[in-house]
């Protein structure tokens, strides 16, 4: 058993070294584009609840471009007859996970979102796979699944 654990630790170090190599062909996430059925309501949610800022709009598509200092989002308005995403039967984005700075901030978001009829809470804050991370899952006003998660630092 000790050999197995040592082997797994060795392989994970080798793998992480390979992933962190300078010659990797891709970098971090640049932005996410979400199709939304309620552009104004979804934009308001990301701005007023999650702290994003609008840095641009495109009235032709229409779209809103948002940023929170760490990530950018493009919200694209769908046609009126758009079909909702079915995570078990369609290929596509299952959910968007957004970091929250503390457990207290996660609980505060839950309390704020709980009073919003246009936002569906799939589950309240709970430990993720036994911890130490804690998360909750919601559907923003257009129905996109958003995970709000806090992972405490390892210090």
What name fits each language-model region?
Residues 1-4:
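Positively charged n-region of N-terminal signal peptides that target proteins for export
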Residues 7-15:
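Bacterial N-terminal signal peptides
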Residues 20-40, 93-98, 152-155:
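N-terminal beta-strand motif that seeds the catalytic metal site of vicinal oxygen chelate
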Residues 36-41, 97-142:
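Vicinal oxygen chelate
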Residues 60, 65-110:
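Mid-chain, structured segments of secreted extracytoplasmic proteins
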Residues 66-69, 138-141, 151:
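Active-site beta-strand termini and strand-to-loop segments that position acidic
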